[in-house]
Amino acid sequence: MLMPLGGLLWWWCCCCGWYSCGLCTPAPQMLRHQGLLKCRCRMLFNDLKVFLLRRPPPAPLPMHGDPQLPGVAANNNTLPALGAGGWAGWRGPREAVGRETPPLPPPPPLPPSGDDDWDGPATGPPASLLSSASSDEFCKEKTEDCYSLGSSLDSGMRTPLCRICFQGPEQGELLSPCRCDGSVKCTHQPCLIKWISERGCWSCELCYYKYHVIAISTKNPLQWQAISLTVIEKVQIAAAILGSLFLIASISWLIWSTFSPSAKWQRQDLLFQICYGMYGFMDVVCIGLIIHEGPSVYRIFKRWQAVNQQWKVLNYDKTKDLEDQKSGGRTNLQTSSSAQANLPSAEEEAASPPAREEGPTRAASHPSGPVSQHHCAYTILHILSHLRPHDQRSTQGSGRELVMRVTTV
């Protein structure tokens, strides 16, 4: 290795000496070539430093089962391996794959140089090491974030939270007022009352279970609170109130003018009779307006009542709910069974041929028999079938039967 280096140095000195002697250059350019010689010498020393102090090439990776050499990393792409293999000669002994590496000799001292801005490879870690270290740190941070997210989710599943304010039991007692389960099972009583006051509905919007709430007492009138109303709700309240007042006033005046002896002349006047008709029409309009806006006003009143009254919300009782469902199912089953029991009897009577010897007079003289217990339309059709002539029925065919299905509405 030293022979090519010596030859290179000899060739460089010869070239520089040839030009420095002035054999090929004129005298005025001597100073300039001296400066070039200094620069070239400096570049030569820098190349020598790079050549002598460069990092040794990495050793080949050992196969499975082969003993690993000290100071050689198992994987050059990871931070611990690089620290053990690549940086062992620069930072002293470190652990590599569970073994202690023997101490290596320190690097040779750098030769003096006038170039203060030169940065050799020993002044800092290589770019591959920095990139691998940053990638390892990024993977570690992502792993920690995933672990913290998973632990927070696990803790959230274990700790019950209010489905309205998302707070735990430290904000108050948690109740389960409906059939909902899981993360939407629990809620605080104040949160639920406030939600009811905003919606105006006393049933769950998910499972449609009506909350079991007990009214304790009404607040002091001085403590009553107003609820937020939209423009449409204000118009609905005003329409319902004005319609009710007009309906009360007009009905009162019509009753007085109809039955009062002093208003006898009004009842005979044509103008007042026209007014009676107009007031009657307006009363019908007011009744329709009240019926249309009544549910909205009632919902607003329930919202106001939820805010200005003290309540106690009861927990969901599964056994009681099952009993209520069973009782309701039995009632519906009895109703449907009674309807189905009446249906075959009606079909049998409709399908049975009438007695020919009794004639139409006997059928018409007993309308209060079992036929009258069914629907009115069936009774009329049954009577009409008896009133038809016998020969007309025989010509239409004796194999046809009249079958009717009667359902209750």
Swiss-Prot record:
GO terms for biological process: protein ubiquitination. Its main location: Golgi. Keywords: Golgi apparatus, Membrane, Metal-binding, Signal, Transferase, Transmembrane, Transmembrane helix, Ubl conjugation pathway, Zinc, Zinc-finger. Gene3D superfamilies: Zinc/RING finger domain, C3HC4 (zinc finger). A zinc finger (RING-CH-type) spans 154-214. Its EC number is 2.3.2.27. Pathway: Protein modification; protein ubiquitination. It catalyses: S-ubiquitinyl-[E2 ubiquitin-conjugating enzyme]-L-cysteine + [acceptor protein]-L-lysine = [E2 ubiquitin-conjugating enzyme]-L-cysteine + N(6)-ubiquitinyl-[acceptor protein]-L-lysine. SMART domains: RINGv. It is a multi-pass membrane protein. Zn(2+) 2 binds at residues 178, 180, 204, 207. Residues 102-112 have a biased composition (Pro residues). SUPFAM superfamilies: RING/U-box (SSF57850). GO terms for molecular function: ubiquitin-protein transferase activity; zinc ion binding. GO terms for cellular component: Golgi membrane; Golgi stack; trans-Golgi network. The RING-CH-type zinc finger domain is required for E3 ligase activity. This is E3 ubiquitin-protein ligase MARCHF4.
